[in-house]
Amino acid sequence: QRPAPATGFPTRTAQADLEFVLHAGHGEFARAVYTPGTIEEAFYVTIKAFNIAEKYQIPVFIMTDQHLADSYRNIETFDLDKGKVQRYIISKDDSKNTKNYKRYQFTESGISPRAIPSWIEDVIYADSDEHTEEGHITEDADIGRKMVEKRFYKKFSGISQEIERPTAYKLGGADVVLLGFGSTYGVMKEVCDVADDRKIGFIHLSQVWPFPASEM
């Protein structure tokens, strides 16, 4: 992210791309948007982002900026066991027993089984037009409604159960509470620490979509 319009300040920091990332697209679809504020968050959130993208088969965005990219400091060694990326693909052994494979199968979670071409005997069809469960083009209104429900409402519900909790700092007795996301973490924390005459706290969001309303 950088100040705009056009190329703007390509080596400076801004957060003006948020609305674009939240809403741009052809029609509605589920997505997740992460906004890490520290080096540690950037590392662990990236692992989480890959897992959410693989599990729900959706686009996931990590919004950073020059300030975070250029920052450096001493940190604790990353815990590599804290998060590992899972692929959520039908295993090669299970693929051998898969018959009548439906790439866009209707499920309770909205997540369709994902197979690797050549691992199963069936042909895998994928289409960018509205499609049937098998992947063939369709203009059937009922199927279209079910597909929207599958890939948006059901997936959104699942993603909402795996939200990153906001970071709260000095909220007890605070007269002013700052709210921010991304690299504003550092400046908000410093303001709270140096404010001698006012009680100031902050809430930092490392995930802005789905919005963590239940955690606020």
Question: Over which residues does each language-model region extend?
Answer:
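N-terminal start-of-chain detector that recognizes signal peptides
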Residues: 3-8, 33-35, 148-152, 198-200
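Flexible, low-complexity linker and terminal segments
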Residues: 45, 50-216
